Structure formats: structure tokens, C-alpha cells
A protein has these predicted regions:
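Short acidic/polar N-terminal linker immediately downstream of export determinants
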Residues: 5-54, 69-77, 107-122, 185-203
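Short, surface-exposed interaction patches in beta-rich subdomains
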Residues: 28-38, 65, 143-144, 152-153, ...
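Repetitive beta-strand solenoid architecture
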Residues: 39, 48, 58, 92, ...
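Exposed beta-strand and adjacent loop surfaces of beta-rich binding modules
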Residues: 42, 61-63, 84, 130, ...
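Flexible glycine-/small-residue-rich
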Residues: 47, 66-68, 100-102, 125-127, ...
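Surface-exposed edge beta-strands and adjoining flexible/disordered loops or tails in beta-rich
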Residues: 60-62, 149-152
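Mid-chain, structured segments of secreted extracytoplasmic proteins
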Residues: 66-111
Length: 222
């Protein structure tokens, strides 16, 4: 009898753990940031969870809309969770760093609560500036950038629209598990380790994309 009771309690505990997040709703809080940024400068992004939209424009300025997204049972319960996410913007002009900080991890439960916290970014940056981006879990969209790009994503999809194929010097896109698609030469590959590469000695722009699990899509911006 005691064994059966223990089994029922364990089953209920597991069921509660699985269903708990499903009962929560999403709440969000939006903040905006801006800083001067010059052509051919470098924007470095370090993000853990959340989607990232980046668009190039003809302005010497970096504008960021950061949406903190949390899962909670009510709006009141969501308010203290926003404080667990910190958006840090450092530097200006030639070098800018954007980071998302999470609460310190504990050794006995290193990922506790992280699934409830994310930051989505919408970014406008000089079209001829350079980008270095690292994201653990999230989708990335990049459009209208002519500078160098280095994109590393663990879990998610990356979509890049290339403004000018003539200016593209090199493209390397690789997924450890997933798919890679490009309309530059009609390439479409999937499975384990798909990759595509492109080289034009007269071009100027270099793009390097690496995804652990997900997809890479490279298109002409028409």
C-alpha cells in the first residue's frame, strides 16, 4: 500500500511538472534603446533565448526594441520576473555590444526557470556595419546588411536576405542537424551536416553562419 501511494504521488508530481508551464500565460514588457553607430562599426550580440530581427538602414544610429517575455499565472506574478532579465548595451560609434543577462545558475538546478524567460530583439543598424551574433535558442532574421556577418545559433533558424549578390565575396552556411537552403544557385540540402559555400573574388561581404540544430535560409533581397 505504501509503495502504491508513493508511486501515485510521484506520478502526480511529474504530471504537475509537465502541465505547470502549460497553465501559464505569456506577458511582455518592451524597452527601447539607441546609440550612435558609424559605418563599418561592429555590433556584437550575445543572446540566450529569444528571436532577433535585424534590419540595415541608412542612418548613423543603432536602435533596439527589446521585448522581455515571461510566463506566469497572472500579470502581477509576471512583474518580478522581468527583473530576472537584464539588457545591457555598451559602447558606441565603432564598437557596440548588446547582451542579455540571466540570473546566476545553481549547480543543483542549472536551468531552473529559464524556459519562462526570453528577450526578443528588433534592431535597426547602419547597413554597412558589421555583425557578430551568438544565440542559444531563437530564430534570427537579417535583412539589408552589406557588412560582414558571423552568426552562431545553437537551436533555431537563420534567414538572411542578401542586398547585393555582386558584393558578396564569401558565404559559408552549415547546420549540424537540419537544413540549408539558398536561392543563389538553387541549393537545398538537409539531414546531418548540410552546408553550402560561395566564393566571389571581386566581392567585399563575408557571411559565416553555423547552426547546431535548425535551418539556414539565404535569399536574394529583391
Amino acid at each position: 500500500m505504501a509503495w502504491k501511494t508513493k508511486w501515485v504521488l510521484v506520478s502526480l508530481w511529474l504530471l504537475w511538472g509537465l502541465c505547470g508551464p502549460a497553465r501559464a500565460d505569456e506577458f511582455s514588457q518592451v524597452s527601447r534603446y539607441a546609440v550612435r553607430m558609424f559605418s563599418y562599426g561592429l555590433l556584437t550580440i550575445d543572446s540566450r533565448m529569444g528571436d532577433i530581427h535585424i534590419e540595415g538602414w541608412d542612418e548613423p544610429r543603432l536602435e533596439i526594441e527589446a521585448e522581455k517575455v515571461v510566463r506566469a499565472k497572472s500579470e502581477e506574478a509576471a512583474k518580478p520576473l522581468y527583473k530576472n532579465l537584464t539588457v545591457i548595451l555598451e559602447g558606441k560609434d565603432k564598437r557596440v555590444v548588446l547582451r542579455t543577462l540571466y540570473p546566476p545558475r545553481r549547480m543543483w538546478r542549472p536551468f531552473r526557470g529559464e524556459a519562462r524567460l526570453a528577450v526578443n530583439y528588433r534592431i535597426k543598424m547602419p547597413f554597412d556595419a558589421n555583425l557578430a551574433l551568438r544565440c542559444v535558442d531563437g530564430d534570427v532574421w537579417i535583412r539589408g546588411l552589406e557588412g560582414k556577418q558571423r552568426i552562431l545559433v545553437n537551436y533555431g533558424d537563420v534567414e538572411i536576405d542578401i542586398p547585393s549578390v555582386d558584393r558578396l565575396r564569401s558565404l559559408y552556411a552549415h547546420a549540424w542537424l537540419g537544413y540549408v537552403q539558398s536561392d543563389l544557385h538553387g541549393e537545398d540540402r538537409g539531414g546531418f551536416g548540410p552546408r553550402i559555400s560561395f566564393w566571389n573574388p571581386t566581392g567585399e561581404q563575408d557571411i559565416y553562419v553555423k547552426v547546431r540544430m535548425g535551418g539556414v535560409f539565404v535569399y536574394r533581397d529583391e
